[in-house]
Every structure is written in structure tokens, then in C-alpha cells.
A protein has these predicted regions:
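A conserved beta-strand element that flanks and buttresses the S-adenosyl-L-methionine
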Residues: 108
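Class I SAM-dependent methyltransferase SAM/SAH-binding core
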Residues: 46, 50-93
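A short glycine-rich, Lys/Arg-flanked "PGG" loop and its adjoining helix->strand segment in the class I
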Residues: 120-135
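Conserved alpha-helix/loop element of class I SAM-dependent methyltransferases that forms part
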Residues: 8-33
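Conserved class I S-adenosyl-L-methionine
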Residues: 33-41, 135-164
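Short alpha-helix
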Residues: 174-193, 200
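Conserved Class I S-adenosyl-L-methionine
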Residues: 199-253
């Protein structure tokens, strides 16, 4: 399903979850230090720059030099260049990049697990980069939404292959290495990452099905409320374009 910029409600829900976590970090620290965020695969700074604008110290790790150049430019334009650190590397290098003071207060792996060769190793690296008691936020492409999206578009053969494929791919030309469902993401984080899953939400459940932004003064608010509720309600949650999971590394906060 193709995302439309006119329906940002699901992104707002993810941002709210991150903001709530960072508020808790600040409360525990008594406001004495800026929260430390590690954004793995953060590319051009979609999440990093807004988080830096909220007062966080953000390290972005990405293998693309071009994406990191865009990140630096966006950070300068937003006036937060001093709070954004760009590191060229991949998830395998996290052990060398991690702070020497115990890890990050929040680790992001948004749009990461779809592309890595070894998702188990990636999740373990994300978990290891988080400080004890800190959260890991994962956003990953949903399998069932991709099936439905292709059916609606008339690409039935692709939908059948995607549904039957163990990795949720429609063929050799698929740009993603995998798509996942909520159970798969939860198992990966808990079993392989040793994390405790606290939140599972659908990201863009129904917004992409709305032909245009609803009319009227309450239209956008109604869509936002519907998306918020659907993202928490199985089985609608499981049909989301992406699955958002917040999990925590065990240990004292």
C-alpha cells in the first residue's frame, strides 16, 4: 500500500510513543542530562532531526554516505547540528560505536530489519546497544498489508507469492529481504534479543485505504482517532503497513 503524505496520523502515533519514552527518561534523570538516542539505519534523519530538536543527543548509524550527508544538511538547517552525530557503518559495527557510558537511553531500528542479512544478529546488536532498562523501538514492514495491497492493485500473482513465501517476498525483484507479522517481530525481539516487549502497534492501518483526506473540520481528527484505535486492535493492528514494537532491555532503569 502506497503511503500518502496527506495522512500523517500513524507517524504521529509512533512519535508519541517515542516522546513518552523520552519523557520517562528525563524524569528518571531528573532533567540533568539530554537523553541519548541511537538511530540505526536512520538514513537522512527522518527521526533523528526531530528528536534532536526535542533536546536529545542523537547518533545516527547508516551505511550510506549520501544519506548521512543529507542528515548533516537537515540538522544544520534545523539548528541542531551540535546534537546530531553521523557515523557511517552498519548494525555489525554497533559494538564499536556504542557509548562508553553504558549504552543509549533509546535505540531505534526503524526500517532496518527488512534489509539486513541477519535479523537475529541485528536485534541482538540493537539490544546490546541499549542501556539496561532502556527501550528499543522497531518499525518493520508488515506482511499482510503487502498481500492486500497487491490484491487491490490487481497484482494477484505477486500477492500469492508473497503470501506463500516464508519471508513475505513477492519475488527476486522485491527490494525488501523480508516482511513480518506481529508474532514474528515479537518472537524475534523476545527470544533472540532477550528484550521484554511492552507495546505492539500497527503503523498505518487504515489511513492508506482512505481515498482522500476526510472533509469537514473534524475529518482529520476522526481519521487520527480511527487510526489510533485500529493500531491497537487485533486483527486490524496486524494488517498495518508497518508494525511498531517497543521493547525493553531488562535491568534497572
Amino acid at each position: 500500500m502506497t503511503a500518502r503524505p496527506s495522512a500523517p496520523t500513524a507517524v504521529d502515533a509512533v512519535a508519541r510513543a517515542l516522546r513518552d519514552e523520552l519523557d520517562a527518561v528525563r524524569t528518571r534523570a531528573g532533567g540533568s542530562a539530554a537523553p541519548r538516542v541511537l538511530d540505526v539505519g536512520g538514513g537522512s534523519g527522518t527521526w533523528a532531526v526531530p528528536l534532536a530538536a526535542q533536546g536529545c543527543e542523537v547518533t545516527v548509524v547508516d551505511s550510506s554516505a549520501n544519506a548521512l550527508a543529507v542528515l548533516r544538511s537537515r540538522a544544520r538547517d534545523a539548528g541542531v547540528a551540535d546534537r546530531v552525530r553521523a557515523v557511517q557503518g552498519d548494525v555489525d559495527a554497533l559494538a564499536d560505536i556504542a557509548d562508553g557510558n553504558g549504552g543509549a537511553d533509546l535505540v531505534l531500528g526503524h526500517g532496518l530489519l527488512e534489509y539486513v542479512d541477519d535479523p537475529v544478529a541485528a536485534v541482538r546488536a540493537l539490544a546490546g546497544a541499549a542501556a539496561p532498562g532502556s527501550a528499543v523501538s522497531v518499525l518493520v514492514a508488515g506482511r499482510w498489508a503487502a498481500v492486500l495491497g497487491r490484491v487491490v492493485a490487481g497484482r494477484v500473482a505477486e500477492a500469492r507469492r508473497l503470501l506463500a513465501d516464508p519471508l513475505g517476498r513477492w519475488g527476486a525483484g522485491d527490494p525488501l529481504l523480508r516482511r513480518m507479522d506481529t508474532d514474528e517481530v515479537r518472537a524475534l525481539l523476545e527470544r533472540d534479543g532477550g528484550l521484554v516487549v511492552e507495546q505492539v502497534r500497527g503503523h498505518r492501518v487504515l489511513a492508506d485505504l482512505v481515498p482522500e483526506t476526510p472533509d469537514g473540520p473534524s475529518g482529520a481528527a476522526d481519521l487520527a482517532a480511527l487510526e489510533e484505535l485500529a493500531g491497537q486492535t487485533p486483527p486490524l493492528r496486524d494488517l498495518a503497513s508497518r508494525i511498531h514494537v517497543v521493547a525493553r532491555r531488562p535491568g534497572p532503569r
